[in-house]
């Protein structure tokens, strides 16, 4: 049974019993990420420097320790968090916790190593600034949610990142790696009491109490008005993100039904494929995706097309929505139920998946979603419920459009015309 274990001063341990193997998957770190970095990339650079030596081990010694004691070790930074993650055998888990703890708590951020690592991150920023999909997604989010913090990219601005000092790194840890922001997510065959003991021993007991980060991107609400942003770039293709509002994660029934609707519309030879590929050959690729949080979210058409077919794609979206609003056939309902059973039978659950799932459940819902909640939801997969979900989602009152590639805004139909076409 997954559980949330509250530790001292608000530190959080998320635990799931691993019944599949004797391995332990864990994520440890802080609920403080790039959204609050003011586009400096400080959190991300901090993550990189965790591997560059501590007060106890030099860079070379730490590298050797990691090589000898970890089968899998990495770290990651998002807008909301910075964590170390690993997947280890039962025999090595204490040593894995010990080394991870030293990396978090005692990294020196050596000045010479810091300057070297900045060059590594600089290359990441250059690649990201050349990634048309990433640019279109970023522009969509900051327009649709209209929160200033979203403008802060996790990698940061190159010039600002290059100016970060050792002193800033140390202060970042001092201010943010506190008990109130600490989180650990663990899937292990070891009992919860043992994992709790290790987390306290190697992490929480060494942290001070401090100021809790109250910023939560999962609480964002959608902008009240439609919008469109176009970024002209010299590329071979155009990327379009055309989004409409959809419900967030808190309503489990609605969220589950929406996932079934997406399975129906986006399948091979389904309505989405039919309108964009079979009938008119409009796109290089097409998908219908979700981007949701606790309260609000987006359902967006993820399109790659050519410059001359951008406007035609809006008409295809209109035709697609008109078709699906006619309702789902009973044979497709039966197919969805059959597919659900097949997926359920195939799923075993890797400890790494459980570990990450626990953390995302906690961030998205503020709690852990139990397996039986999803199993109970299967009974809601009926034609009546699916039709109601389709009508709710595909009758939007606003639309958000992000376009990037070899196209100018003046060549795209006006937003007001797109609104009349798709919203009515």
Model-predicted segments: where are they?
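Active-site SXXK
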Residues: 41-54
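Charge-rich, well-structured scaffold segments of protease-associated domains
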Residues: 6, 59-214, 249, 278-424
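Short N-terminal binding/cap micro-motifs at the start of the first secondary-structure element
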Residues: 13, 23, 36-38, 411
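Short pre-active-site segment immediately N-terminal to the catalytic Zn-binding motif
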Residues: 30-40
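His/Glu-based metal-binding/catalytic segments typifying zinc-dependent metallopeptidases
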Residues: 16-32, 210-275, 423-424
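Residues embedded in well-ordered beta-strands
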Residues: 12, 25-29, 183, 241, ...
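N- or domain-start disorder-to-order transition segments that initiate the globular core
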Residues: 1-23
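A residue-level signal for beta-strand positions that form part of recognition/binding surfaces
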Residues: 10, 25, 81, 227, ...
């Amino acid at each position: 049974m997954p559980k949330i274990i509250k530790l001292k001063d608000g530190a959080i341990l998320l635990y799931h019993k691993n019944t599949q193997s004797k391995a332990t998957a864990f994520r440890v770190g802080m609920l403080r990420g790039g959204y609050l970095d003011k586009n400096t990339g400080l959190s991300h650079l901090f993550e990189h420097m965790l591997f560059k030596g501590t007060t106890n081990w030099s860079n070379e010694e730490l590298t050797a320790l990691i090589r000898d004691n970890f089968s899998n070790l990495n770290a990651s930074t998002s807008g909301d968090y910075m964590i170390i993650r690993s997947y280890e055998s039962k025999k090595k888990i204490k040593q894995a916790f010990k080394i991870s703890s030293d990396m978090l708590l005692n990294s020196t951020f050596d000045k010479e190593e810091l300057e070297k690592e900045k060059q590594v991150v600089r290359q990441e920023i250059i690649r990201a600034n050349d990634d048309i999909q990433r640019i279109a997604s970023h522009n969509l989010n900051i327009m649709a949610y209209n929160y200033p913090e979203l403008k802060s990219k996790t990698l940061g601005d190159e010039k600002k990142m290059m100016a970060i000092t050792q002193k800033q790194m140390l202060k970042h840890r001092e201010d943010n790696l506190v008990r109130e922001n600490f989180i650990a997510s663990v899937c292990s065959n070891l009992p919860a009491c043992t994992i709790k003991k290790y987390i306290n021993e190697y992490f929480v007991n060494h942290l001070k109490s401090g100021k809790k980060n109250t910023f939560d991107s999962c609480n964002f609400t959608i902008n009240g008005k439609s919008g469109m942003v176009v970024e002209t770039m010299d590329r071979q293709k155009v990327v379009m993100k055309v989004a409409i509002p959809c419900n967030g994660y808190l309503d489990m029934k609605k969220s589950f039904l929406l996932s079934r609707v997406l399975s129906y519309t986006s399948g091979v030879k389904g309505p989405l494929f039919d309108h964009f590929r079979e009938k008119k050959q409009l796109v290089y690729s097409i998908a219908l995706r979700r981007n949701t949080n606790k309260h609000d979210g987006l359902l967006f058409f993820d399109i790659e097309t050519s410059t001359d077919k951008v406007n035609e794609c809006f008409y295809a979206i209109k035709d697609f929505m008109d078709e699906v609003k006619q309702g789902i056939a009973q044979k497709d309902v039966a197919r969805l139920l059959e597919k659900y059973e097949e997926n359920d039978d195939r799923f075993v659950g890797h400890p790494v998946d459980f570990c990450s799932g626990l953390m995302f459940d906690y961030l998205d819902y503020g709690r852990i979603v139990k397996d039986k909640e999803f199993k109970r939801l299967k009974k809601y997969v009926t034609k009546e419920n699916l039709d109601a979900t389709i009508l709710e989602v595909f009758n939007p009152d606003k639309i958000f459009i992000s376009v990037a590639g070899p196209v100018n805004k003046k060549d795209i139909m006006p937003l007001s015309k797109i609104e009349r076409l798709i919203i009515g």
